[in-house]
């Protein structure tokens, strides 16, 4: 598998960043999370004057073999149909990208359909759909490695275009199932608490989904390593997103983490490279069952709680103005000395 050079941000600049933030014309700590974000971004970028450049949202798309077991309300053709909607600008992620100035990239990681690549979709297809992990591994070792490498390749292109803040989204009917499997494997939270309605299952549907996933977990006979669990239960788009996250961290980019699926992707990524979490900002807590539990297990502090469960990167993009405010705070607020205000604490 491709290796990455991911290190914790150098702490040498922390004291200077903290002093700058504390000497802005406000009571110490009074801008709360904005101050925490400014410190984190300053550490990532190793500067007292951080900036956000050319924000991009990448949607990785693929189909899932486990859908054959009736674990999703939506048929798998919704995957390619929604991609068509992205291309026409009519999806939830489209208006948010337009509103907040994000470039949108759509990547075919493994859609079970022949997509119109000439219309701007990035063709990184590894295979048409993952396999059904109720019976066999979702992907081979070679396919997993290709996903990691191709996700990294997309991010290197974003970086070359001047991007330093990256939101990652997904499109793939069945991917909440893979997310639940990773969540229970890596946090040891009982599977039943990790399984939710996905795109809208009723209580009976959720119970059936849980039963199928529990059978898959019971049938698993791998070595139990993070690498093997990612390969066995993962989605092609999700593993490609892991490659993207790891490459972004190596390039010292800000990673905006979206909802339940992307949270479990960075959870999985952190099993391979724990330092990746230093580059992550968690955009929101979604409405999918299990999202709060996995965030809590990671010690993550999401910026928003809007009851979202769409995916696509929508929650991460919604959080962007808060991140922008944090950067503006450290760059645009005056300090006590320059403003001739007595420092009163």
Curated annotation (Swiss-Prot):
Its EC number is 2.4.2.21. One of its GO terms (molecular function) is nicotinate-nucleotide-dimethylbenzimidazole phosphoribosyltransferase activity. One of its GO terms (biological process) is cobalamin biosynthetic process. InterPro entries: Nict_dMeBzImd_PRibTrfase, Nict_dMeBzImd_PRibTrfase_bact, Nict_dMeBzImd_PRibTrfase_N, Nict_dMeBzImd_PRibTrfase_sf. Keywords: Cobalamin biosynthesis, Glycosyltransferase, Transferase. Pathway: Nucleoside biosynthesis; alpha-ribazole biosynthesis; alpha-ribazole from 5,6-dimethylbenzimidazole: step 1/2. Pfam families: DBI_PRT (PF02277). The active site is at 312 (proton acceptor). It comes from the Bacteria. It catalyses: 5,6-dimethylbenzimidazole + nicotinate beta-D-ribonucleotide = alpha-ribazole 5'-phosphate + nicotinate + H(+). Belongs to the CobT family. Catalyzes the synthesis of alpha-ribazole-5'-phosphate from nicotinate mononucleotide (NAMN) and 5,6-dimethylbenzimidazole (DMB). This is Nicotinate-nucleotide--dimethylbenzimidazole phosphoribosyltransferase. It comes from Bacteroides fragilis (strain ATCC 25285 / DSM 2151 / CCUG 4856 / JCM 11019 / LMG 10263 / NCTC 9343 / Onslow / VPI 2553 / EN-2). The lineage of its organism: Bacteria, Pseudomonadati, Bacteroidota, Bacteroidia, Bacteroidales.
